[in-house]
């Protein structure tokens, strides 16, 4: 009986060392060696070297001179500590009213936009933290951004096209644009927008107020 206990104890200790110590250390070491940026959170820095967010977590931009992400049901909006969808079903009256309100707001804020409002701009993602838009949803907002920054529409569209990411491995997912990286590209190309007073006009620059 005692030998059986020792065998079980040795098995338990060896298993804990392998799975609780050696395996995590090996995975962490390989990640830091091969993918240091991704392993540390895919941090994004501005032109002055300041961390302004993560490429994996969306931020809620609202100023006219920046591209806006999808609506978010994560807390008060893009709250990294409260990731969630709206949990509203397709027959929900509340979902219909929310989408209608978003549609009205988008049309009011984008009077020069061509074509119908892209569906993703009136619907939340499952996580509430989606950092991407489709190229079509970004281009739809380009006229507003160009007008707010006082530059030609074609120049803003050039920035959008330069930030389009293709399908992963060429086959997975759809082409997409990272909203934070796109807005940083705008600031590099045309200069940052002047700071807004707290609570007025949304974020003054990418990363301001990021969770």
Swiss-Prot record:
User: So which domain of life are we looking at?
Assistant: Bacteria
Matching InterPro entries, A to Z? KdpC
Indicate the transmembrane segments per the record.
13-35
For this record, an example GO cellular component is: plasma membrane
Sorted keywords for this record are: ATP-binding, Cell inner membrane, Cell membrane, Ion transport, Membrane, Nucleotide-binding, Potassium, Potassium transport, Transmembrane, Transmembrane helix, Transport
Show the coiled coil region(s).
none
Q: List the disulfide bonds.
A: none
Location in or out of the cell: Cell inner membrane
The family this protein is said to belong to? Belongs to the KdpC family.
Subunit organization: The system is composed of three essential subunits: KdpA, KdpB and KdpC.
Give the protein name, as stated in the record: Potassium-transporting ATPase KdpC subunit
